[in-house]
Structures are given as C-alpha cells and as structure tokens.
Amino acid sequence: MGSSARKKKEKKKDFQKTKLRVGKTKAKADNFTDTSFKSKSIVVNQQSLTTSAPSNVVQFTHYLSLASSSKSDTQRKDALSFLTTQLSSQPVNEAIPLPTAVILPKLLPLILDGNASVRSQLLKFLRLLPPADIGDRVESALLYTRAGMTHLATEIRVDALAVLEWLLQVAGDDVVSCPGGWVKTLKSFMSMIGWTTSSATSKWSSASRVSFGISRASFEKSGKTLPRQLLVLSQFLKAGLVEPDTAAQPTTSDNHFPLFDVERHMIPSRANAYAHLNLFGSSRDEEGEMYIDREDRQRVFHKRFQADVVTGVEHAKREAGEAGRAAAVLTKVLRDGMNDYSGVDDTQ
C-alpha cells in the first residue's frame, strides 16, 4: 500500500500547478540554458571608432588621393565633389587645406579623363582655387590643356577649351608669357581648327578641317565646336596682343614730373622676374621661348600665324550663323592687336 500511494503521488506532480509565493522567483526548468554574456568592447574589422573625427586637412588629403588615383569613374567624381564642397563652404579669408602647388600636379591629368562628369567636376573645383596661386603654375597647366586641345575625342577638346578660358581669366598675362605659352598654344589652336599651311604648295588649306585623321563631321558633331574655338582663340589673342585699357590711355609728362617710368624700377611683383633671360637654363627654340613683351608676341604672330588666321576668319565669315559672329569678334581682336605693328624692328 505504501509504495503504490507513493507512485500515485509522484504521477500527480507532473499535473500540479506550482503555487508562486511573493518574494521568490520562479523555479528554473530542468533543461534551462544560460545564454547571458558580458562584454566590455565590440571589435569591428576594418573600422576605427574614435572619439575625435579626422581634421579637414586629413580628409582633404584623403579625397585628393582618391580623385587622382582611383580607377573608378564614380569614385573620382565623388571625391572631386567633396573637395569642391569643402572649398566652397569654408570662409573667404581662410586658407585652403593644402597649397595649390600640391593640388594642381595631382589633378591636372584629369583634364584628359575619359569621363565627362569627372572633367566637369574638375572645372568646378579649379574655379574655386585662389587666382593669385595659379600664375606660377600656368606652364604645367598648359601642358595638359594643349594635350586636351589636340585630343582625339571631341568632348575632351571642348572641355580643354573651358580650362584654357579659366586660365585666361585668372592669369592671362602668365598664359601668354610663360615658356611655350604663346607659340605652342597658337599651334594647338591651328591644329584643332584646321587652319594649316601646306608645306608642299605653300597654300592655305581647310579642305575638310581634318586633324589627326578625323573628318569635319566628327570634329563638329555638336554644331557649336567651331564658334567655341574661335571665341576662345579671340580671348587668347586679346590677352597677348591687345594692350590693357590702363596701359592704352595716353599720359602726359606733366602728370608724372619729375618721376618718369617709376614702375620699371620697382621691385618685381612676380616670382623669377628674369626667367625670360634664361641665364642658367637649357637653350630654348622659338616655340619654347618666353615672350614677355607685347611687341615680341606681335612679331611672332605676324611671322608665323597671321596670314593663316586672317584667311581662316574670312572662310568662317562665309558660314554665317554662330561661326560668322565668332569670326567677327576675332576680326576685331586682330584689328585692335595688330593695328600698331609695323614690322620695322623685325630683325629675326
């Protein structure tokens, strides 16, 4: 009897509800597994969680490296967009995070980039750089600009003209007076437009405006390539041949008596003021020479380019439309820049 009553009591345990008492926790099940854990830190691979954010200089350097070396078009464009935003949002009187001498050598090769968005974003960034810092770097900038002007792709040639236009706005005097800035750039214009003189017949030719094996249809597929080229050429010739308004104003000796030509004896305001003398550099040819004076630029232009340009302008006027209007602007620049050239002192 005792054993059977005990067995019945044990069976009833499985079906009895446990009464909870105040102040006592519920009993844990027999198959309970403790899943709680304690951790003092969380480690995430390839990430660094710090209390202080990187400085503007560090961020600028990082994105500058991405813009200049990344193989992804999207990444280069986004990096340039970040750099543009950072420059445009900083105070006017605050210096840029990195010197222009460090920025330009890294970004100038992007003038020849195959992606149109990258080139467009590059031009927006270049326009935010301090104009005073561009003059001493014009020579290196023109190397890539001239390469873009004679590129096989039409879009790159058009964007290279926009870069040259920006250079003329911020440092026009340096563009036309730096080594190779006058003759080599004019040769690039002549090759790009197709105004060339045949060496065999010594006759001006623009048969199909062919350059590097490209037909006129491909060269001007946008319909506005030639007018754009003529307008930028007008700006370039105006910077090199036309006297500034301040210099063209007549002055009387009474205004400056007893001091004459004071500005010629002042301390030069530009770096390497005697670079045109080429005292210690390698010998230069006519194309790589520096033409500081307006008279020298007039002489070289008259000797090598004026006849072809005048003939090309006359042909462009016959096309009427935008090309004709651009040719009229170029004609006015030629008249203002060369009307006082006599060629008497041309001994070369």
From Swiss-Prot:
Name this polypeptide is given: Pre-rRNA-processing protein ipi1
Region Disordered, annotated ranges: 1-22
Biological processes annotated in GO: rRNA processing
The species this protein was found in: Sclerotinia sclerotiorum (strain ATCC 18683 / 1980 / Ss-1) (White mold)
Transmembrane segments: none
Subunit details: Component of the RIX1 complex, composed of ipi1, rix1/ipi2 and ipi3 in a 1:2:2 stoichiometry. The complex interacts (via rix1) with mdn1 (via its hexameric AAA ATPase ring) and the pre-60S ribosome particles.
Gene: ipi1
Superkingdom, natural source: Eukaryota
Function (record text): Component of the RIX1 complex required for processing of ITS2 sequences from 35S pre-rRNA.
Family: Belongs to the IPI1/TEX10 family.
